[in-house]
């Protein structure tokens, strides 16, 4: 079945008796099932996109397109196109249909590859190999630690037959679009580059996965600690270093893990993100809350929120309450 993501447009006959589309705006056709070219005319008429299927059917037959298949997906056409151009464009796009690709915020690149491959006709092993390829990292200005910061989760329109390499190029293009001058100015004002901002955002995200409205406040706390040359002492970084993301409680033995990601042991930011970061958290870091807090502790109410404090004495009080 074919659905339209646009209200309506008509085909009319101009002075040269040539069928043209009556406006210049685009129309998006959404095809839920594969459609034979011989069926296109009737479908367009049923959706009030053509006055009659006769001309387009004759043209399709003349071009020997009738046995071709328009695969399910989304196709963008223009109102101003002639019938001839409409048929030609649909023929060119028949195997390049568009889908909404959801790039999720997940724990690591392995999970991401599985999610992407399930939506596209991709080899997940090949895609993961490319994600770990140092030449790919260098090509786009990253390294093995920072490459995951290039992924900006969102829903994007892509061709279903996109290759693994083209997908990475597409992801890189969306990264560049996301980091516009406004965001870059804010990052520069903080004194960090994009990967460092994303790394900090990944810690904020993994620290608070329930109450999103607390992200900017937590970001402000970590920025205060960085400015004060204090260790971040962020539990999620230790869990990442241990490869134990579901560890419920950290003990002193865990804090001794020798890893650059262990922010209990080393000052500053870890070398790269500890997850694929939701862009909203990146924005929360760029627009962090300004305060003097340097400690936080989960509230005893188990509400998902934290008690924040600016002194160790106050922090110890909250710890006892918890």
Language-model-detected regions and their locations in the chain:
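Signal peptide-directed extracytoplasmic domains
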Residues: 7-178
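Bacterial extracytoplasmic/cell-wall-associated proteins, especially those involved in peptidoglycan
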Residues: 102, 120-122, 136-322
């Amino acid at each position: 079945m074919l659905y339209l993501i646009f209200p309506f447009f008509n085909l009319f006959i101009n002075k040269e008796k040539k069928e043209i589309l009556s406006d210049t705006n685009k129309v998006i056709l959404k095809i839920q099932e594969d459609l034979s070219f011989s069926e296109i005319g009737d479908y367009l008429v049923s959706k009030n996109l053509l006055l009659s299927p006769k001309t387009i059917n004759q043209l399709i037959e003349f071009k020997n397109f009738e046995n071709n298949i328009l695969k399910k997906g989304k196709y963008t056409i223009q109102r101003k196109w002639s019938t001839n151009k409409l048929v030609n464009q649909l023929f060119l796009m028949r195997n390049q249909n568009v889908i909404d690709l959801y790039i999720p915020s997940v724990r690591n690149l392995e999970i991401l590859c599985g999610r992407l491959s399930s939506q596209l006709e991709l080899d997940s092993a090949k895609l993961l190999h490319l994600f770990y390829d140092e030449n790919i990292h260098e090509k786009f200005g990253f390294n093995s630690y920072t490459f995951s910061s290039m992924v900006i989760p969102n829903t994007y329109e892509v061709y279903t037959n996109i290759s693994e390499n083209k997908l990475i190029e597409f992801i890189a293009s969306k990264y560049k679009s996301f980091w516009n001058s406004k965001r870059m100015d804010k990052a520069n004002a903080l004194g960090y580059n994009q990967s460092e901002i994303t790394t900090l955002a990944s810690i904020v995200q993994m620290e608070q996965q329930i109450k999103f409205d607390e992200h900017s406040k937590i970001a402000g706390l970590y920025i205060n600690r960085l400015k004060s040359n204090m260790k971040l002492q962020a539990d999620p970084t230790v869990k990442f270093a241990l490869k134990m993301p579901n560890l419920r409680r950290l003990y002193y033995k865990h804090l001794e893990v020798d890893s650059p990601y262990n922010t209990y042991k080393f000052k500053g930011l870890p070398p790269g993100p500890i997850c694929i970061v939701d862009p909203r958290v990146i924005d929360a870091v760029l627009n962090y809350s300004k305060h003097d807090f340097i400690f936080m502790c989960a509230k005893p109410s188990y509400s998902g929120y934290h008690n924040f404090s600016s002194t160790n004495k106050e922090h110890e009080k909250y710890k006892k309450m918890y």
